[in-house]
Amino acid sequence: MKAYQMKIAIKNSHPPIWRRFIVPAGLSFSQLSIVLNGVMGWCGYHLFKFEFYHLRLNIKEKYEDFIGLGEEEQLEASETIIDPFMEQEDWFSYIYDFGDYWEHRVTIEKVIEDYGPSYPVVLKYKGETPFEDCGGIYRYYDLQEILKDPSHPEHENMKAWTEGHFTRDYDLNEVNESLKRMALEKKKSKPMLQNEIYEE
C-alpha cells in the first residue's frame, strides 16, 4: 500500500511543536484533516482549510461557503483526494480554527510504496498540544506565563480553565491507538481533479 511520510509543525511555535507521521494514500482532504487533528491532538470541532500557495489553491470543508472569496481556486475537501498533490508538492499549509487560526506547515518528506498498515502512525513528536480555544499560538504562550506566575491576577481563573477542560499530555501510544481505530474509507476523486490541476 502506498503512503506518505509527513511532518506537521505549528507556525511560530518556539520551540517548534511538531509531529512526524505516515498516512495511507487514497484519502480525501476531509479525511486528511481528521488525521492531522488526531496527530496533533486537536479536538477537531473547528473549520479547516488547506492552502497550496504556488498553485493559488485552497481546499476547504464546504466549497459553497467560500464561493467568490479571494482569487484562489477553491476545491471541496470531501471531493478531492490527496494523492496528486502529495506526489507533486513539497509542502502545504493546514489551518485549523479560523478564530484562533492555528497555521501548520506540513512537509511531505517521502512517498512510501510498500506501507503495511491501513491506518496512520505517528513516528516522533516534539511539544505538547496547545490548549484548544486559547486564542492562538501567541495567546498560548501568554497563558503559559500566567500559569507559571501565582501572583498574576488571572492565574487562578486560567488555572481552573485549563484544568477543568483542556489539560492533556501528548501520549504517543494513545494517539496511535486512536489513529488505528479510524475507519478511513478511500475515496475516488473527480477525474478533473487528478487530470487537470497540473495540466499546465
What do these predicted ranges mean?
Residues 1-200:
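Short linear regulatory motifs enriched in tryptophan with gly/pro/ser
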